[in-house]
């Protein structure tokens, strides 16, 4: 079995609290230097990397002089706000040593649920990756309530994987991977090297093993892998204490548990766009645009749209129909229906003049467009 990381181009790496803190007592700066070095190695290989990092609350607890992790939500949020400053400062320092720039991105589950915010977050992250910047993502613990719970950053890692359509999610933890049972209680438990993400038997195997430092046990990682597989991403759950673990995974070495998505990325996205989104409106295409979208799989430009039907917002799903009214594609609109009516039949260069701003040059980007 070869690690999927060898062939993956876009990777989300989630690093747990126990791998970036001194047993919960503030940040482990030597560990951060190691992660920066390994991620820099991946990027030298031509890979795009997004880092989802825990550690803000633990660093905040240290800076505030508290002896233990608080149980009250408002105190956790205060610790997160204080600690996030130190986390960003530390990551900026260690990545600068490798001539890499970093960007802080704080997200909530609500950002993923709202289509407009979802598209904005996606566009920002993809722009950062195109600029060779390392986005460092954490949950916005200062403003959320229900999300400061078990497994928040495991879930966040999977959501980010879906958001940017990454090829793989790597969840680094202080455990070797998944066993058929808790090896601390069952010495005969067997290690699971590879399985299909979403297999219900995996959840029974996961048990409740987890670190006291972080908030996620193995079950949350299994569920995160299941979520990541929805966009066709394979997940690797591996021990972050293995020497050069990311570089070795990139070499193809089989480390940890690999949970394979059953559908590839494009098949998963096609199913999601075609079957699971409620259509909010229709765009009527001229013959040239209909041919370009269906035959050449191009983005849909405003100049190719001759009519806009219905009322929709940026990020809503819309049907694309030809001049005979037959649906030929559907996708996520970059502009609202009102804006679309203003820019239809116009070349891209006119968007800023017509709207006063330009978001994206296309009405629907080809990555958000599926032919039917």
From Swiss-Prot:
| Annotated Pfam families | AA_kinase, PUA
Compartments (UniProt record): Cytoplasm
> Which residues does ATP bind?
14, 173-174, 215-221
**Keyword Membrane annotated:** no
Q: Which PANTHER family match?
A: GLUTAMATE 5-KINASE, ISOPENTENYL PHOSPHATE KINASE
Q: Name one GO biological process term.
A: L-proline biosynthetic process
Stated family: Belongs to the glutamate 5-kinase family.
Protein task: Catalyzes the transfer of a phosphate group to glutamate to form L-glutamate 5-phosphate.
GO molecular function terms listed in the Swiss-Prot or TrEMBL record: ATP binding; glutamate 5-kinase activity; RNA binding
Source organism: Laribacter hongkongensis (strain HLHK9)
Give the main localization category.
cytoplasm
Quick one: which gene encodes this? proB
All residue ranges annotated as the PUA domain in the record: 280-358
- Report the protein name in the record: Glutamate 5-kinase
Q: Which Gene3D superfamilies match?
A: Acetylglutamate kinase-like, PUA domain
